[in-house]
A protein has these predicted regions:
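Helix-loop "lid/cap" segments that line or gate small-molecule binding pockets
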Residues: 114-123
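Alpha-helical interface subdomain recognition
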Residues: 8-101, 110, 123-128, 135-140, ...
């Protein structure tokens, strides 16, 4: 493994044109990549197809990840975490999950680490940290983030779930949908309106826990892709939530969400670039072996032109993503830069996997081939975490105002 490789795996890329060397990783990152890759190969890859069929990953996988130190990388060591603020370790996990083709099985962990845990680290008081962080690092407590509602998607400020305060308790009523880790989760960072008359300034974050009376989970939603990732509806009927489960300050929920979105969108971009590179690698392998009209499919001019186009665009995207990773590690990544990264890489990911399916011919439509699973898994990338249209609105507004 070395920083000069795309993912350090070799494959078809290593047989021909070398990718542009990556310079953002050091030896300790390469060692971490090798360890995480080995864990994926031994603990996830052999079972991924079964979990895809069952549409959920077992809790034992979370316990294994926690034991190996892959959960809570940024959590202080006193709570059982890795104690690092270096985002590059999280990026490596997203890359390896994407490149290995086990997005459904691994997506829940990146959500837990990179999207949910930052709320706990930035907003929890000491009592809350003691109560939740050790379990979240060990894999005993699985986290989720509940924003989207049946009638509210991109309009985050339009959530209708309410939390009415009575003494030391909030009474929560409402519903959420499309919640990743929705079945497995033990604690859910939930957006609620504590003052419906105040618009987005009346939004707060509450920690809803498994077993609270009135907190029910709906069905495990049957998605196009990412089948091993449990995604559920959540229902709240007069759920009494202790005021001690308020995350941060009342009325600051919208601000907290906006503050954490840059890392979420960067993480999606990191994974998108990895899947695009993997799709090209799989397609190079396939087209070099598959023959038609007496020669390898890779030798046809159309195949070479398509692969050249996809390779060049993916390399350009990777350079931009790597620079965004560096900026994020320096605390300088802007919301607009993260939005641009997510928009460009996820649209490219969908383009790459679609063109690569075409080069596989009929076999590209068979789920036993990783390219078919990647095609289904990839489609959500330009939707969740902010649609491409919203990303372009953010970037466009930064350019022209309004």
């Amino acid at each position: 493994v070395g920083p000069g490789w795309v993912w350090g795996r070799g494959g078809a890329y290593s047989q021909g044109m070398q990718p542009i060397p990556r310079t953002i990783y050091a030896d300790e990152h390469d060692q971490f990549r090798a360890a995480f890759r080995g864990w994926l190969d031994s603990e996830v890859v052999p079972h991924h197809e079964q979990w895809e069929h069952e549409q959920i990953t077992p809790r034992s996988l979370w316990l294994s990840a926690g034991k190996q130190g892959f959960l809570g990388l940024t959590v202080p060591e006193q709570y059982g975490g890795g104690g690092t603020d270096d985002y590059r370790f999280a990026a490596i996990m997203a890359e390896e999950i994407g490149y290995t083709g086990v997005i459904g099985s691994g997506n829940g962990m990146t959500l837990h680490n990179d999207i949910v845990l930052p709320y706990f680290l930035g907003l929890c008081n000491d009592e809350q940290k003691q109560r939740f962080l050790p379990g979240m690092c060990a894999g005993d407590i699985i986290g989720a983030l509940a924003i989207t509602e049946p009638n509210t998607g991109s309009d985050v400020g339009g959530v209708r779930t309410t939390a009415v305060k009575h003494g030391d308790t909030f009474v929560v009523n409402g519903a959420k949908t499309f919640i990743s880790n929705g079945i497995n989760s033990d604690v859910v960072v939930t957006t609620v309106k504590t003052d419906p008359s105040a618009g987005h300034r009346g939004m707060s974050l509450l920690l809803l826990e498994r077993g609270m009376p009135g907190f029910e989970r709906g069905r495990n939603l049957d998605k196009m892709g990412m089948h091993a990732q449990d995604t559920a509806e959540l229902f709240f009927t007069d759920v009494e939530v202790p005021a001690a489960n308020l995350l941060g300050e009342e009325g600051k929920g919208f601000y907290y969400l906006m503050h954490n979105l840059a890392q979420e969108r960067l993480g999606i971009a990191v994974g998108a670039a990895a899947v695009a590179a993997a799709a090209i690698d799989w397609t190079l392998d396939y087209t070099k072996e598959r023959k038609a009209f007496g020669q390898p499919v890779a030798h046809f001019q159309n195949s070479k032109f398509v692969l050249a186009e996809l390779h060049t665009e993916t390399q350009a995207a990777q350079v931009y993503v790597d620079r965004c990773i560096e900026l994020h590690c320096e605390g300088k990544l802007t919301a607009e830069q993260a939005a641009a990264a997510k928009y460009w890489t996820t649209e490219l990911q969908n383009k790459v996997v679609d063109r690569c399916v075409q080069l596989h011919g009929g076999y590209g439509y068979m789920r036993e081939y990783p390219i078919a699973r990647a095609w289904a898994d990839s489609r959500i990338q330009s939707i969740y975490g902010g649609t491409s249209e919203i990303m372009k609105e953010i970037v466009g507004r930064s350019l022209v105002g309004g």
